[in-house]
């Protein structure tokens, strides 16, 4: 009797672990903007303590950006999106690799490269939201 009481009445499915529906590449972009801004600040400040703190924060922000891209890739984008945008797998992969390069560098160009890839992913994301 209890099993019938607690049995689901309606079967539902979700695209992620929790069907919140809140996805946005802006999260990755903001973290990547932080990476680039930190790289620029590092170039203008040679204080050792600042450099160490900036390096730690830059690496954390790059990891967060990579995480947000991974969530988009694994939870938001679905097979129909990859069929419509066959370059999407490569774009996400290149963006993540660019963020890894930015972690290992103080050159703002590496941060900008990650931002450029994220901008392309953002464009595709919003096109899929219109569909």
Swiss-Prot record:
- Which terms are listed as keywords in the entry? Antioxidant, Cytoplasm, Metal-binding, Nickel, Oxidoreductase
The organism's superkingdom is given as Bacteria
Task: Name one cellular component (GO) term.
Answer: cytoplasm
User: Where, in this chain's numbering, is Ni(2+) bound?
Assistant: 15-16, 20
Which cofactor does this sequence's record say it needs? Ni(2+)
Instruction: Tell me the GO molecular function terms.
Output: nickel cation binding; superoxide dismutase activity
Q: What is the effect of changing residue 31 to A?
A: Loss of activity
Question: Which Gene3D superfamilies does the entry link to?
Answer: Nickel-containing superoxide dismutase
**Which InterPro entries does this one have?**
NiSOD_sf (IPR036502), Superoxide_dismutase_Ni-type (IPR014123)
For this chain, the family text in UniProt reads: Belongs to the nickel superoxide dismutase family.
Propeptide spans which residues? 1-14
Outcome reported for the amino acid change (mutating residue 53 to A)? Loss of activity
Q: What is this protein called?
A: Superoxide dismutase [Ni]
Subcellular locations according to the entry: Cytoplasm
């Amino acid at each position: 009797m209890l099993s019938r009481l607690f049995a689901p009445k309606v079967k539902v499915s979700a695209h992620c672990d929790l069907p919140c529906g809140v996805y946005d590449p802006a999260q990755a972009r903001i973290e990547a903007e932080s990476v680039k801004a930190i790289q620029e600040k590092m170039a203008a400040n040679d204080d050792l303590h600042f450099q160490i703190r900036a390096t730690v924060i830059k690496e954390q922000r790059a990891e967060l950006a990579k995480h947000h891209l991974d969530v988009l890739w694994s939870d938001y984008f679905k097979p129909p999106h990859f069929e419509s945008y066959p370059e999407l797998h490569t774009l996400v992969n290149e963006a993540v690799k660019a963020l890894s390069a930015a972690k290992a560098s103080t050159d703002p160009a590496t941060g900008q490269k990650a931002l450029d890839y994220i901008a392309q992913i953002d464009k595709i994301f919003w096109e899929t939201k219109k569909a």
